[in-house]
């Protein structure tokens, strides 16, 4: 019955409001960046839109481990599992710190969103090009030096089945090379809202678990510590999930 009520609300009210807010938010970001308010634009319009989007989709968020959130002036490479497109709203709306996303190159071409991300100077990476990876490292360094943290999904893409996929090494190389700690975060429940290859969202509660920061230096010497840190991070992030399942580490 609750799902029926949700769809009776969603199509005439929730979905139109979501699309309108998308256009308003991305347009605001683009204009504000053009006028020189890039730091404000890269954070606050997306924060408000993310909170609104979760509310419009009847998907409340419970936060565990808020005491691990960075204090003012601290920068991190923030890593999280990638359950669905709603992960963006969860992190943007509930992890309140200055940051830049590291995004797949394909997202640059999304209507409205791609242009807004470009204007906000988010970092696009194409794993197939060595030059793109090198550019990502340089942009990451500039981002951290400017006082912004970096958000990365180390799986590289959304999960196909709800399990945590094997982590790629890019986030951990970046953390090591730039000498910043990693902040692991677990998202649980977003997969139930919108699994990959589906387009009709379902309301569901989300739990956001913020873990204690870790460092690549905790796991030995370079380069062996990169693979070890990736495996240990995957274990940390997977632990709070309800079925506690992961793909092969």
Question: Residue ranges of each PLM-predicted region?
Answer:
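Short gly/ser/thr-rich secondary-structure transition/capping motifs
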Residues: 57-64, 133-134, 190-192
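Generic preference for hydrophobic
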Residues: 63, 78, 101-102, 208-210
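Catalytic core of membrane glycerolipid acyltransferases/transacylases, capturing the structured
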Residues: 22-47, 55-58, 71-130
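Membrane-interfacial terminal anchoring regions of lipid-handling membrane enzymes
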Residues: 1-33, 44, 69, 227-249
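A short beta-turn/loop motif at secondary-structure boundaries
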Residues: 67-71, 200-201
């Amino acid at each position: 019955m609750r799902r029926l009520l949700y769809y009776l609300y969603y199509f005439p009210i929730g979905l139109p409001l979501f699309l309108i807010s998308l256009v308003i938010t991305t347009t605001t970001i683009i204009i504000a960046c053009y006028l020189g308010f890039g730091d404000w634009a890269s954070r606050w319009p997306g924060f408000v839109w993310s909170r609104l989007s979760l509310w419009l989709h009847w998907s409340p968020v419970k936060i565990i481990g808020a005491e691990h959130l960075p204090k003012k002036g601290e920068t991190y490479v923030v890593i999280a599992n990638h359950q669905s497109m709603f992960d963006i709203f969860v992190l943007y709306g509930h992890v309140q710190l200055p940051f830049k996303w590291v995004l797949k190159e394909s997202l640059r071409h999304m209507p409205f969103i791609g242009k807004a991300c470009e204007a906000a100077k988010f970092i696009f990476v194409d794993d197939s090009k060595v030059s793109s990876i090198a550019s990502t490292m340089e942009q990451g360094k500039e981002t951290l030096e400017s006082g912004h943290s970096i958000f990365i999904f180390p799986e590289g893409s959304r999960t196909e089945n709800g399990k945590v996929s094997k982590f790629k090494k890019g986030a951990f190389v970046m953390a090591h090379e730039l000498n910043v700690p990693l902040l692991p975060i677990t998202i649980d429940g977003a997969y139930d809202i919108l699994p990959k290859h589906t387009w009709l969202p379902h309301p569901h509660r989300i739990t956001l678990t913020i873990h204690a920061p870790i460092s690549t230096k905790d796991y030995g010497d370079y380069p062996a510590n990169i693979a070890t840190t990736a495996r240990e991070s995957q274990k940390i992030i997977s632990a709070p999930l309800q079925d506690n399942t992961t793909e092969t580490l």
